[in-house]
Amino acid sequence: AEKDCIAPGAPCFGTDKPCCNPRAWCSSYANKCL
């Protein structure tokens, strides 16, 4: 089953899923969790 979070380096723009890393955030510029 797919986890309900965004893996490091995966595209995140346009989704409301959180980053799997709680210390990361979605960078709209890089379009990935940083």
Swiss-Prot record:
Disulfide bonds join 5-20, 12-26, 19-33. Pfam families: Toxin_30 (PF08117). One of its GO terms (cellular component) is extracellular region. The keyword tRNA processing does not apply. It is found in: Secreted. PROSITE patterns: ASSASSIN_BUG_TOXIN (PS60010). Keywords: Calcium channel impairing toxin, Disulfide bond, Ion channel impairing toxin, Knottin, Neurotoxin, Secreted, Toxin, Voltage-gated calcium channel impairing toxin. One of its GO terms (molecular function) is toxin activity. The presence of a 'disulfide through disulfide knot' structurally defines this protein as a knottin. Binds reversibly and blocks N-type voltage-gated calcium channels (Cav). This is Toxin Ptu1. It comes from Peirates turpis (Assassin bug).
